[in-house]
Amino acid sequence: MRDGFAGYHPAVNALFFALVLAGAMVLDHPLCLAISLCGGAASHLSMMGRQKTGKALWYVLPMMALAAVVNPAFSHAGATILTYLPSGNPLTLESLAYGLGAGAMLGSVMVWFACCTHVMTADKLVYLFGRTAPALSLVFSMTLRFVPRFSRQLSLTVQVQRGLNGGEEPDGLWQRLRLGVRALSIVITWSLENGVETADSMRARGYGLPGRTAFSIYRLTERDRLALVWLMGWGGYVLCGALAGGLGWRYYPTLRGTAVTPLTASFFGAYLALCFTPVILDWEEGRRWRRSASKI
């Protein structure tokens, strides 16, 4: 069965998302932002398919556009004046570029977090942090599961409320508002009760007690070790490039970045390889499957 990047050891998944999320939030060079955004979108497409990726981008792109528009509307710093707004404030190239960069950073972080919630399931989080920080791992795993479960339960509750109404849509804005408020109140109560029941259940099973053992299906295989070496190698090289100033960029007072040299180009290439790791691994696995199928 093909499982792609999600089938790797939880340590591989956790290290990858720690690296790409840190890079998306720290590296503000336009090329790094573009690599991170494209890598996140390609990984999302590889993991979840075209339909879910299109739905995710439907929410992400407007948020990016909003961030790109808001910054030049309120920030007027910068030396290159393009024009003047009706308020009399200047519209500068630097504020516009900073807004675009902020939008790209926001979009890439949102896409990477969507990939992270898909790959880092609750059992993986409990496996990684259950021994060292059992309470934190339980809370974190419940938090990652909360949004999709809350959405499903809200949709189910709305359907039940409509069924009690004879299956008819509520008439008028006021009736629809009452239905929405009632459904939201029911789901909030359900989520609180579910959290308490989960905590009581885990406590009854001895979760978090000293010396407690737990069964795990995860084993560090040879391919996991190679993936860890791959991630640590590219991640360490990108970190060295960032500390050396090879990925530096300045938005104010003028746009300025590190000169492009073979050395700085290698830093960008390393970051590209890092961000597209899930796509590369999925492509390699698909190639092996096709080769195995051709021999049958």
Predicted regions and their residues:
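Juxtamembrane/interface alpha-helical elements of multi-pass membrane proteins
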Residues: A56-W174, R290-I296
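Transmembrane alpha-helix interface motif
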Residues: R2-L45, L156-I296
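Membrane-interface helix-boundary motifs at transmembrane edges
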Residues: S46-K55
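Helix-boundary and loop/linker segments of multi-pass membrane transporters
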Residues: A6-P10, T53, S87, G130-R131, ...
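N-terminal leader/targeting helix
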Residues: K55-A56, A183
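Membrane-helix interface segments
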Residues: P30, R50, A133-L136
